[in-house]
UniProtKB/Swiss-Prot annotation:
CDD domains: homeodomain. It is found in: Nucleus. Residues 57-68 have a biased composition (Basic residues). Its main location: nucleus. This is Homeobox protein CDX-1. SMART domains: HOX. Plays a role in transcriptional regulation. Involved in activated KRAS-mediated transcriptional activation of PRKD1 in colorectal cancer (CRC) cells. Binds to the PRKD1 promoter in colorectal cancer (CRC) cells. Could play a role in the terminal differentiation of the intestine. Binds preferentially to methylated DNA. The keyword Nucleus applies. InterPro entries: Caudal_homeobox (IPR047152), HD (IPR001356), HD_metazoa (IPR020479), Homeobox_CS (IPR017970), Homeodomain-like_sf (IPR009057), HTH_motif (IPR000047). Residues 57-123 are annotated as: Disordered.
């Protein structure tokens, strides 16, 4: 016999979710003893508490994986021109000179064109 007829979705109350989250924050893995205490206090079965913890750990793994992927994508993207470092004295160097930190399109158009610098970086 399959369990599909018996299955139903448990909707937890705000209080139940809060208590389960508090317990999860304390420990990601619940002990047998604490599981039975929590189930009795919240009016849930031990099986429901166990499944909630399994699902919560899966959710945490999913969120952490997504965060890690976002961080990797940010590290792979080049720095925007407005965030390029300036010389130590804080003044922009003229474009086109050797050692200049400001990118230029002088080689393409024939005339130097400095990158705009945010006001907070100007002397």
């Amino acid at each position: 016999k399959t369990r599909t007829k018996d299955k139903y979705r448990v909707v937890y109350t705000d209080h139940q979710r809060l208590e389960l989250e508090k317990e999860f924050h304390y420990s990601r893995y619940i002990t047998i003893r604490r599981k039975s205490e929590l189930a009795a206090n919240l009016g849930l079965t031990e099986r429901q508490v166990k499944i909630w913890f399994q699902n919560r750990r899966a959710k945490e793994r999913k969120v952490n994986k997504k965060k890690q992927q976002q961080q990797q994508q940010q590290q792979q993207q080049p720095m925007p021109p407005t965030q390029l470092p300036l010389p130590l004295d804080g003044t922009p160097t003229p474009s086109g000179h050797p050692g200049s930190l400001c990118p230029t399109n002088a080689g393409l158009l024939g005339t130097p064109s400095p990158v705009p610098v945010k006001e907070e970086f100007l002397p």
